[in-house]
Amino acid sequence: MSKQSLSYKDAGVDINAGNELVERIKPHVKRTTRSEVIGGLGGFGALCALPAKYKEPVLVSGTDGVGTKLRLAIDLKKHDTIGIDLVAMCVNDLVVQGAEPLFFLDYYATGKLDVDVAADVVKGIAEGCVQSSCALVGGETAEMPGMYREGDYDLAGFCVGVVEKSKILDGSKVQAGDALIALASSGPHSNGYSLVRKVIEVAGVNPATEQLAGKPLAEQVLAPTKIYVKSVLELIEKTDVHAIAHLTGGGFWENIPRVLPENVKAVIDETSWDWQPVFKWLQEQGNITRHEMYRTFNCGVGMVLALPQAEADKALDILRAAGENAWLIGRIEALNAGEQQVIIR
């Protein structure tokens, strides 16, 4: 009796589905190309030249995911914007150091490849790359039977950017008297989602049908993370930006001190902006303390920038002309013994 001849597909890996996905995403990937990219998809490695305008180029790299926002997106079958979140989390971390994103790669892992879902995700990744002028040069699609529950997948992103060595933003220029400007977020972005999901569970609501300020709750908690690359790079070019903090995990308390010298503090006026309805709803439904809100969520502020007070009005004009909602939210002061580096009052 002859044994059955087994194939990779019998083991749960469909190479043809993977090939179909590659064909489906090619038009989206093509939208992201930059002149520095050499070759196309399909090589063992992606090739990218450095832009000629840089005299002393320094490469800046970053990697990130979207946390358990992905769980919410999968449960609500909203796959077309989670890729924007993935790109945003990486490129926003690069631009706060003054870097222009050059290229991006993604990792998509699942138990059984659903080509339609994966194509939607990559379409979002490509859109995020377009928004940040970053080339999507490659990625890995891993179909791994037995590793994930049916319908589940995971994402990771990797980005490389470049900055002129003399223009690296490291916070060393921040000084007492600097103004603090906030850039509005689009919602919780991609942080705090384990708490978001817990609040939804405790509240006993269906985010797809629950209405908040005239919109479904699902739409507000899954709003894609704002990408600030183009507006911030323009601001850096036209003003003397001293530092930028990307408000991600750890919120205000942990991210702002990352860009401050040890001898100063950020004093923030919380009446200078309004929390979006989704943050008020989360605080109320979860009975979350003010301190915990500022530690877990961005509370409506995606980035905080420090620059000379004399340039504050000019900076606000530039940012608003670029389509950003921006406010003056505070100032840098000298740090006294025993004080925290972030004071919100």
UniProtKB/Swiss-Prot annotation:
Domain of life: Bacteria
GO CC terms, sorted: cytosol
Keyword Nucleotide-binding: yes
Reaction(s) this enzyme catalyzes, per UniProt: 2-formamido-N(1)-(5-O-phospho-beta-D-ribosyl)acetamidine + ATP = 5-amino-1-(5-phospho-beta-D-ribosyl)imidazole + ADP + phosphate + H(+)
Enzyme Commission code(s) on record: 6.3.3.1
Matching InterPro entries: PurM-like_C_dom, PurM-like_C_sf, PurM-like_N, PurM-like_N_sf, PurM_cligase
Keyword flag Ligase: yes
Keywords: ATP-binding, Cytoplasm, Ligase, Nucleotide-binding, Purine biosynthesis
Pathway: Purine metabolism; IMP biosynthesis via de novo pathway; 5-amino-1-(5-phospho-D-ribosyl)imidazole from N(2)-formyl-N(1)-(5-phospho-D-ribosyl)glycinamide: step 2/2
GO molecular function, one term: phosphoribosylamine-glycine ligase activity
Main location: cytoplasm
Cellular localisation: Cytoplasm
Uppermost EC category: ligase
GO biological process: 'de novo' IMP biosynthetic process; adenine biosynthetic process
Family the UniProt entry places it in: Belongs to the AIR synthase family.
Matching HAMAP family: AIRS
Protein's name in the database: Phosphoribosylformylglycinamidine cyclo-ligase
Organism: Actinobacillus succinogenes (strain ATCC 55618 / DSM 22257 / CCUG 43843 / 130Z)
Lineage, highest ranks first: Bacteria, Pseudomonadati, Pseudomonadota, Gammaproteobacteria, Pasteurellales
